[in-house]
């Protein structure tokens, strides 16, 4: 696909209108048609955006860049964040495990659908930690449901339980938005998760510090 360049600006996509309100997600020119290129000024202080599906004028752009640059979330590939894809239970477990500093995990979990082996150790440890600390439980008997989506209501509860575990503010002022949305049973996308995570970190005043494991732990600064 052709991506234009302009010095000092970032390309945000193709649009069908001059006001740049109707973005074209698929462009196939079969006749005379006018399209418009969207641009925003580059921020020389910001890290490079590796994702081809996250644009500078997206509402969630700053949230995605924050969680990516801080190591709280990664893409589903080196160049794809999949902002509109539902977040999964396994991905949520990994996020909160990372935020806690990826602590050492002892013992095993009882889930029959979370395997320990090459390429799955990180997820296994995250799920085991989430279960042992009461952050997340089973979804169906002895199954964790790692690929199952997460609802807004469930994610709000996970944020609350995590805040309790870590001694953070559990009042409405300290929690991420989400529990006050009308569709609590609706599933949460990866972009919405990034937004809620960014809000939570800022509302709680959390800062990255080096954990004993060598990972980064997010906690309130000590005076």
Please place each PLM-identified region on the residue numbering.
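Secondary-structure capping and domain/repeat boundary segments
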Residues: 1-65, 70
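Alpha-helix C-terminal capping/helix-coil junction sites
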Residues: 68-69, 127, 131-132
